[in-house]
Amino acid sequence: FVKAMDLSSEKSRAEFFAALSSRGEKVKMLINVAGADIQKAFEEYTQEKLLFQCRANFEGAAAMCLYAVQHAAKKAKIINISSVSGIYPMPYFAVYSATKGALTSFSLSLSREVKKRGITVTAILPGAMPTREDVRKQIREQKAWGKLAAEPPSVVARKSLRAAEKGKRKVIVGFWNKLMNAATKLLPLSLKMKFIEKRWSKISKDAF
């Protein structure tokens, strides 16, 4: 069973859910991996682009989770691909970091709610993943920093499945990303945001 769907569209999701329901099957595993990594100053957004990114990164994933928990098989597993970018505020990447932060928080909350039913919810926080060519180019331009923070999609997929099998609630992918997360906890928020602003204010991308 294969059916294309626009995760940011409520109508498209409804059609997808109807198609699934007609088959009468229970959800054994859900992996939410779709997202929009638009990166630019917030004032440069349009209302349409803002809603699209929020829906693609959070609303769509939450809607999929709702269907999954309402039609879950025993010991069902849900994997939500979030991002290390959602751990702290990111100027010039504000909407992306906010939506990924929301997805992480939602995943952790949901994992507690459905634990008694034997359903596992795991939030995966990778760094950059070299998927589209513009992303690969950006990683190359960041040189050593980009290479250290990036993980191939195959590695993220393998670690995500392993984490779900172990019943973990949240996993940061990559030694460098784990190290940076631990180190930045020692820094004041103003300093972290100043550093992030300096790096990301020079970059603007919108492949959507």
Language-model features, listed with the residues they occupy:
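Residue(s) in the substrate-gating loop at a strand-loop-helix junction
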Residues: 83
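Active-site helix of classical SDR
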Residues: 65, 99
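SDR active-site lid
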Residues: 116-175
